[in-house]
Amino acid sequence: MPDYDNYTTPLSSRYASKEMSATFSLRNRFSTWRKLWLNLAIAEKELGLTVVTDEAIEQMRKHVEITDDEIAKASAQEAIVRHDVMAHVHTFGETCPAAAGIIHLGATSCFVTDNADLIFIRDAYDIIIPKLVNVINRLAKFAMEYKDLPVLGWTHFQPAQLTTLGKRATLWIQELLWDLRNFERARNDIGLRGVKGTTGTQASFLALFHGNHDKVEALDERVTELLGFDKVYPVTGQTYSRKIDIDVLAPLSSFAATAHKMATDIRLLANLKEVEEPFEKSQIGSSAMAYKRNPMRCERVCSLARHLGSLFSDAVQTASVQWFERTLDDSAIRRISLPSAFLTADILLSTLLNISSGLVVYPKVIERRIKGELPFMATENIIMAMVEKNASRQEVHERIRVLSHQAAAVVKEEGGENDLIERVKRDEFFKPIWEELDSLLEPSTFVGRAPQQVEKFVQKDVNNALQPFQKYLNDEQVKLNV
């Protein structure tokens, strides 16, 4: 039954995918602890600890997935002992009596908590990387589709030289490619804390193996292997260095900036009525203004991107204040910031997937806006054409300057249309180029190499970057909960 009397974060209850929510769920956390205890016991037995029996391992393996009743029992136990790990040690031991005496043998709490966090981080990156790949792929298709469509460029949000809609999309894609590189690097850099003991010296395991250093090292390597990792951090304190969390969250925060910029661009384009995010037939934009088509998905992206970007400072500050081998003031904030970061990144990517799959373009609006500004941009072309007809460059410049100011006054002071070209056509001075004016005002001649840049970028940079991820590419429609 839903619990309507307790607060739940909207990240999981409203927005995030079931897959990401499950990754950071209590069930997965506590079941992962059990997997860690199981694999520790397996490795200890393989290396000769006879106190670990086959029966103990079989019972642990059978009950590695924690039940609702066991979660409740451990929660009640934690209220008594004030230690979450020991509460679960006792609960697991009650379920697996043959293993009760060897669960957590030689380990400290961070064996399960830190190693589990590293597993969650790896798994979370494995969820968001395919989504990022598909966002890039869909935007690349959009860029190619509109590589030749001239649009008014904007600098300082003032009209500037023309570009193409496809070229504008490549600016988003390029930053997303950098994010993909950063995600992959962060994911592949993750190792395990491993089997290190209370202060990282492995003293407890050295005692278990009666001073046999080789077996302690073998234990560390075997547990790492059993958990599916190819590397373990060579030295730690009680915890793995919290600087690793910085390396984990930095790419996510950087991606947040990319997402915010892209969504902001689309929001501005929606105001200009040139490009809009998808809008469902039954979607309501405003409870009062029935005509509204608000860019609510892009607005959500901007909102959550600000949250994701802010979490990076949590990691930086936490890493900087860790004393010696560890302090516990990292614990509470990490329980919040790490899941929040990945849940938020997951939401952003799902939303961007939805947006990029259904962007709506209005070419006629784009064309009308270009026509309103292009005459001013074409003045240099007009000057050059007149000079080729043996006119004085300075005289042409002065005449076109006067006409441009008159046309600007019509636009700004009277609210009229830009009539510069009509003024040029009425001025006998410009008669030598009247027949050329239409060609001088062809928008495609003002976009430079934008179409060629799009083709080269997609065919070379994008395709090469996506080549290792072909198995993830799909055209599935992403449905958002809200």
UniProtKB/Swiss-Prot annotation:
SUPFAM superfamilies referenced in this protein's UniProt entry, alphabetically: L-aspartase-like
Catalytic activities: N(6)-(1,2-dicarboxyethyl)-AMP = fumarate + AMP; (2S)-2-[5-amino-1-(5-phospho-beta-D-ribosyl)imidazole-4-carboxamido]succinate = 5-amino-1-(5-phospho-beta-D-ribosyl)imidazole-4-carboxamide + fumarate
* GO CC list: cytosol
Q: What is its EC number?
A: 4.3.2.2
Pathway the protein acts in: Purine metabolism; AMP biosynthesis via de novo pathway; AMP from IMP: step 2/2; Purine metabolism; IMP biosynthesis via de novo pathway; 5-amino-1-(5-phospho-D-ribosyl)imidazole-4-carboxamide from 5-amino-1-(5-phospho-D-ribosyl)imidazole-4-carboxylate: step 2/2
Instruction: Tell me the GO BP annotations in alphabetical order.
Output: 'de novo' AMP biosynthetic process; 'de novo' IMP biosynthetic process; purine nucleotide biosynthetic process
Cross-linked sites for Glycyl lysine isopeptide (Lys-Gly) (interchain with G-Cter in ubiquitin): 196
Asked if the Swiss-Prot or TrEMBL record annotates the protein with the keyword Iron, the reply is no
Say if the entry is tagged with keyword Nucleotide-binding: no
Q: Which InterPro entries match?
A: AdenyloSucc_lyase_C, Fumarate_lyase_CS, Fumarate_lyase_fam, Fumarate_lyase_N, L-Aspartase-like, Pur_lyase
The GO terms this record gives for MF are: (S)-2-(5-amino-1-(5-phospho-D-ribosyl)imidazole-4-carboxamido) succinate lyase (fumarate-forming) activity; N6-(1,2-dicarboxyethyl)AMP AMP-lyase (fumarate-forming) activity
Tell me the active site.
156, 286
Q: Give the domain of life.
A: Eukaryota
**Subunit relationships:** Homotetramer. Residues from neighboring subunits contribute catalytic and substrate-binding residues to each active site.
User: Family per UniProt?
Assistant: Belongs to the lyase 1 family. Adenylosuccinate lyase subfamily.
Q: What is this protein called?
A: Adenylosuccinate lyase
Q: Which organism is it from?
A: Saccharomyces cerevisiae (strain ATCC 204508 / S288c) (Baker's yeast)
Q: What is the lineage of its organism?
A: Eukaryota, Fungi, Dikarya, Ascomycota, Saccharomycotina
